[in-house]
Amino acid sequence: MKTHKIFWLNLAAIIIISIVVSGGMFLAMKWEQIHLKDGLKKVLSTYPIKNLETLYEIDGHDNPHYENNDQDTWYIESSYSVVGSDELLKEDRMLLKVDKNTHKITGEYDTTTNDRKDATDSTYKSYPVKVVNNKIVFTKDVKDPALKQKIENNQFLIQSGDLTSILNSNDLKVTHDPTTDYYNLSGKLSNDNPNVKQLKRRYNIPSNASTKVELKGMSDLKGNNHQDQKLYFYFSSPGKNQIIYKESLTYNKLSEH
C-alpha cells in the first residue's frame, strides 16, 4: 500500500513538474515573440516614405564594405504575378534606382505574359520611366492610355501602406539572428488588414482570397535607419491561380552595379 502511494505521489510530481516546465517554455516563447514584434515595429514604423525623393538623404544599414564617403543607391522593386501550376502566367514589375549621387530616380516598368497552351508564346515589354517631383513619368511615349495611367499611378506599399499593421495579426512567427541581423516574419493576414485591402482593390484580387505574408530583411531591430527588406503577399482562392505580390527595398554600392 505504501509503495502504491509513493508511486502515485511520484507520478503526480512528474506531471506537475512537466506542466510547470511546459508552461515556462510557452511563456518564454511568447515573451520572445512579443520582444521580436516590438523590434520589428520600430523598423516598420519608419514607413511610409511618401516621397521617394527623400531617399536621397537617407542612408541604409551600415556595411563594412562601404567607405564613409561612398554615395550609394537605393533599389525599389515591386512585382505582381499570376502563377498557375508551377508556371508564371503574368507578371508586372516596377524597378526604380534612387541614385544618391546624382539625385535622380530612373527605372523601368516591365510586363510579361505567357500562354499556358503554348510555352513558346511569351510576350515581354519594357517601359523606361523616371521620377520627377515624386511622380512617375515616361521617358518614351506610351500610346496605351490605360497602361499609361496604371504606371503613372503606381505606388509602392512603402509609400502608401500601413506596414506596422501586419504585426497586429495573431498568426505570425518572427525569428531573428542577432549575429547576422537577419530576420524573418511569416504568417496569415485577415481581409481587414489595410495592406491586404489595398492590394486586393488595386489588382482586383477576389475578396475571399486568403492571404499569407512573409517579411525578410536585415536589421538590429532597433529602428535606427531603413534596412534592406523583402515583403511577400500570397493570395490563394480555391480553383484559382495564385497571386503573388512582392516588394523590396535594398541599399547597394554604386560600383557593384
Swiss-Prot record:
Quote the subcellular location field of this record.
Cell membrane
Which keywords does UniProt give here? Answer: Cell membrane, Membrane, Transmembrane, Transmembrane helix
GO CC terms on record?
A: plasma membrane
Q: Which Pfam families match?
A: DUF576 (PF04507)
The main location is membrane
Q: Does the keyword DNA repair apply?
A: no
Q: Which residue ranges traverse the bilayer?
A: 6-26
Membrane disposition: Single-pass membrane protein
**Family the UniProt entry places it in:** Belongs to the staphylococcal tandem lipoprotein family.
Matching entries from NCBIfam families are given as: SA_tandem_lipo
Under which name does UniProt file this protein? Uncharacterized protein SAV0210
Q: What is the lineage of its organism?
A: Bacteria, Bacillati, Bacillota, Bacilli, Bacillales
